[in-house]
């Protein structure tokens, strides 16, 4: 790109951001922070155990979304969807191995859009999918067209895997409940190195517009972080979540298959409490890295010219419903995830929104805030109006899918979340139905799908769900072993 074209684009972005916020400003930088497998185990989201002062600080600065939902609670498809603005059914990506460009070779990703507008587009760590921990330090399943600079740190954690406690030795540490309270400093761990490199890139590019993707690997298993973060969570303060004794009695087997069909993997409660302690320690470790990024922005005087978006690829189970762990489910804990926007000058800053939003909405939102025109084909909806007025009525709906092994054969789950209801079908109901009333059952303990009193609700939600997402096993290629 010639310097003249670059100057014209930058001037155009200046005008666009001025028009949007009603005050002079230079083009916004974007600090796009991703965490891996982080559920709403954050103090500002109401978690009574979590110690997360820096994410709380970011929430106080910006707009926290309490009801943000991923498109698939699995690393590769959710990240591909979020970064392209296209739903999994459009990308034909449902597993951990298929690249979105196999189906959409000409897709323009969110960071690629910034490149087209003359920004530096940079990545440190995990934005697209990586196998964790074995692909740490590589490009993973990256998209080279998205970036003009990438950094792949590889820390001490990758050299000490032999020290990790694995509660399920028959499974790899990437999938098992496994952890290490590590010796050494934050900066020696991969995520600490990611933070250091991100700060370096912000400093080097402080005088030109940048899009910087910062992708942390934690709290994905194995839960590895410096020992000092374990000290924040005495084991006697860790509790397993409440569930009625008969919680699973009215739920289809497909709702649990592949994710703890046997509660807590059959492990002793003392062990799963240690796993939960390790997860929280990793959350606080990631929180500390976010704090380093915020401090760096302030010290560089970039806070007033940088949008910050913090998100996790999906939610995560920590023993809910009598012992579900990890992801790939369509309950609230797996489908919902943290989302915090800080935009300089946004009128909604310092508040929270209860409106239903989807991760596919991030692409058009970030583009609009920066004065960029996204591709016409993207399927999300800009939530800029909520950032300006978080208490507005949005009437959003979220659609989440999960393709995975179930009772020996692949099964597709599809779920719609409205402000009141969650309705879920497994293979369009052939493998079970679920309906939960969030007005009085936020824990999703009572399945109303087969209650005749709710037949009309089921019919209405079924029509909406089937009109938007695939509810059966797809004909497109997928790897059954990598669901």
Language-model segment annotations:
Residues 2-5, 14, 19-427, 431-433, ...:
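Formylglycine-dependent sulfatase
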């Amino acid at each position: 790109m010639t310097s003249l074209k670059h100057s014209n684009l930058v001037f155009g972005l200046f005008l666009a951001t001025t028009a949007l916020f009603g005050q002079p400003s230079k083009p916004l930088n974007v600090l796009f922070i991703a965490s891996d497998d982080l559920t709403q185990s954050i103090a500002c989201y109401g978690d009574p155990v979590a110690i997360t002062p820096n994410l709380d600080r970011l929430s106080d600065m910006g707009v926290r979304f309490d009801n943000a939902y991923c498109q698939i609670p699995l690393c590769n498809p959710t990240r591909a969807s979020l970064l392209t603005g296209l739903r999994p059914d459009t990308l034909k990506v449902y597993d951990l191995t298929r690249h979105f460009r196999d189906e959409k070779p000409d897709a323009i990703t969110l960071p690629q859009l910034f490149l087209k507008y003359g920004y530096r587009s940079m990545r440190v760590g995990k934005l697209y999918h990586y196998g964790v921990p074995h692909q740490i330090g590589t490009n993973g399943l990256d998209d080279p067209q998205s970036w003009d600079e990438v950094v792949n740190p590889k820390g001490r954690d990758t050299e000490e895997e032999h020290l990790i406690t694995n509660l399920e030795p028959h499974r790899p540490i990437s999938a098992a409940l496994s952890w290490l309270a590590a010796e050494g400093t934050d900066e020696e761990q991969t995520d600490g190195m990611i933070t250091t490199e991100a700060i370096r890139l912000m400093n080097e590019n402080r005088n030109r517009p940048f899009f910087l993707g910062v992708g942390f690997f934690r709290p994905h298993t194995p839960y590895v972080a410096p020992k000092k973060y374990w000290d924040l969570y005495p084991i006697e303060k860790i509790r397993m979540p409440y569930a009625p004794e008969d919680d699973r009695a009215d739920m289809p087997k497909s709702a649990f298959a592949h994710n703890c069909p046997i509660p807590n993997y059959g492990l002793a409660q003392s062990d799963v409490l240690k796993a939960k302690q390790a997860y929280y320690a990793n959350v606080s470790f990631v929180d500390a890295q976010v704090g380093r990024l915020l401090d760096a922005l302030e010290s560089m005087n970039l806070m007033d010219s940088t949008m910050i978006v913090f998100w996790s690829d999906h939610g995560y189970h920590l023993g809910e419903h009598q012992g579900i762990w990890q992801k790939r489910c369509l309950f609230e804990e797996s489908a919902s995830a943290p989302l915090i926007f800080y935009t300089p000058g946004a009128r909604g800053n310092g508040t929270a929104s209860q409106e239903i939003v989807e991760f596919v909405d991030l692409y058009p939102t970030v583009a609009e805030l920066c004065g960029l025109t996204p591709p016409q084909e993207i399927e999300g909806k800009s939530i800029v109006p909520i950032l300006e007025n978080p208490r507005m009525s949005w009437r959003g709906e979220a659609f989440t899918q999960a393709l995975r092994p179930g009772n020996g054969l692949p099964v597709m789950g599809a779920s719609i979340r409205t402000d009141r209801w969650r309705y879920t079908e497994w293979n369009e109901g052939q493998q079970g139905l679920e309906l939960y009333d969030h007005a009085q059952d936020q824990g999703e303990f009572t399945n109303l799908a087969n209650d005749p009193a709710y037949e009309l609700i089921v019919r209405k939600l079924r029509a909406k769900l089937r009109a938007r997402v695939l509810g059966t096993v797809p004909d497109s290629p997928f790897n059954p072993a990598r669901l």
